[in-house]
Amino acid sequence: MHASCCCAPPESVSHTRRISYKYSGTSYPTRTTTTSSSAPEFTNKKQSTAMAPTTAAAAASSNGGGESDGSSKEWRLTAPTRGGAMAAAGDKMSIRAVRYKISASVDDRGPRPVLPLAHGDPSVFPEFRTAAEAEDAVADALRSGDFNCYPAGVGLPAARRAVADHLSRDLPYKLSSDDIFLTAGGTQAIEVVISILAQPGTNILLPRPGYPNYEARAAFNNLEVRHFDLIPEKGWEIDLNSLESIADKNTTAIVIINPNNPCGNVYTYEHLSKVAEVARKLGILVITDEVYGNLVFGSSPFVPMGCFGHIVPILTIGSLSKRWIVPGWRLGWVAICDPKKTLQETKIATLITNFLNVSTDPATFIQGALPNILKNTKEEFFKRIIDLLTETSDICYRGIKDIKCITCPHKPEGSMFVMVKLNLYLLEGIHDDVDFCCQLAKEESVILCPGSVLGMKNWVRITFAIDSSSLLDGLERIKSFCQRHKKKNPLNYI
């Protein structure tokens, strides 16, 4: 029913490499990292044999005495028994790795299609197809023959200018093309921002629950993470009172995600204003993740954090992926929203430029198409997507309320997700959120995202960015699963 390329687990690959960075006179220590695409083990862990470095003796033994074919050489490229920082981060803090692991629990011989309710990629569903204007812009850029070259590290000038104009429409000041840096999706934008801010001894404030890529990148860069809570009883508002208590002189930034992934809430102008004032008082910049910007369908309109750039300097992360439903196009950006030029002395633009000069680029033809994508996409397309998400979010919220073992504290008003609490005391034989998701996948072929990877143990994240019939089917399967696993003692029910 659905494209399989998003769900198939990759081959497990590990390799060791040395990386060092130097930006504007600031040296970052060389470190050894190990990257791995293998998914983490959650339940029914089997004892694994540690892989030791290849020695001459081992090579000789495996080669019948060690012929002179190089196998007797002691190679220093090893498969470590314990992964490096990035491998560890990817193992514990990657939605993709967790999704692969849970997908492996699905019975491939089952008669029903797998329902992907774990991640926000509705592009496989026909009703969520991107705008014709966006497709035409890409086709025209390709056919022109003008965009087959390497782009500048920071992006094509015309594309940067188009993003600046696009964002400026909702801000009380104008951005210039020099304020915009194009990235290979929002994921690379996170990598850039976290990497340039990481200094020995510094820390960053991240939301809990939150998007795990921030924690993974912080771990990779030896940047200490300090969490502030989002309060479910208050519509997932930020616990502002806790910010000053967890920050100190070494705090470098705070991350805000709005509209929120994973919670589905949208922050009001007043709440964002308070966040800006707290950040100003602490002397830290705000990183605002607006990848789901304008995907709102509740009572609160989307307010760009950049509106408060006169209070506190802001780095905005955005992309085409979600609003245009094209995550595979890998086009994102970092925007410096700093009308008072507070960050000028920090040379943050130079740091970003230097990083991107030694990093990968978004595809040139997508950059070439970007001005026409932003300019020509009709409002009717955006309205259609909002109408779809409004309908499916309502279906999701109503369906969750009808399932006794799960609780939704706040109806989603934006993004593509909702966080749901598991009432495990009502269930038999379910140990935690990961166990719930694995057993659900095995028995019902429904894939959910466990809250543990998002910082909320015994919660799950559900996406409603899916066709309505599949969503209804998925909710019915979750309900059936809970009914089968409910505790027999009726006194346990409320």
Curated annotation (Swiss-Prot):
Any idea of its EC number?
2.6.1.80
Could you name the domain of life of the organism this protein comes from? Eukaryota
List the catalysed reactions: nicotianamine + 2-oxoglutarate = 3''-deamino-3''-oxonicotianamine + L-glutamate
**Keywords assigned:** Aminotransferase, Pyridoxal phosphate, Transferase
The organs and tissues expressing this protein are described as: Expressed in companion and pericycle cells adjacent to the protoxylem of roots. Expressed in companion cells of shoots.
- Which is one GO molecular function term here? nicotianamine aminotransferase activity
Q: Where is the composition biased (Low complexity)?
A: 24-38, 48-62
What cofactor does this one take? Answer: pyridoxal 5'-phosphate
N6-(pyridoxal phosphate)lysine modifications at: K322
Signal peptide boundaries:
none
Region (Disordered), start-end ranges: 24-76
Q: Which Gene3D superfamilies match?
A: Aspartate Aminotransferase, domain 1, Type I PLP-dependent aspartate aminotransferase-like (Major domain)
Enzyme class comes to transferase
Chain ranges passing through the membrane: none
BP GO terms, sorted? biosynthetic process; tyrosine catabolic process
Induction per UniProt is:
Induced by iron deficiency in roots and leaves.
The task this protein performs is described as: Involved in biosynthesis of mugineic acid family phytosiderophores, which are ferric iron chelators produced in graminaceous plants in response to iron deficiency.
**What NCBIfam families does its record include?**
tyr_nico_aTase
Similarity remark: Belongs to the class-I pyridoxal-phosphate-dependent aminotransferase family.
| Name used for this protein in its record | Nicotianamine aminotransferase 1
Its taxonomic path starts at: Eukaryota, Viridiplantae, Streptophyta, Embryophyta, Tracheophyta
Encoding gene (name): NAAT1
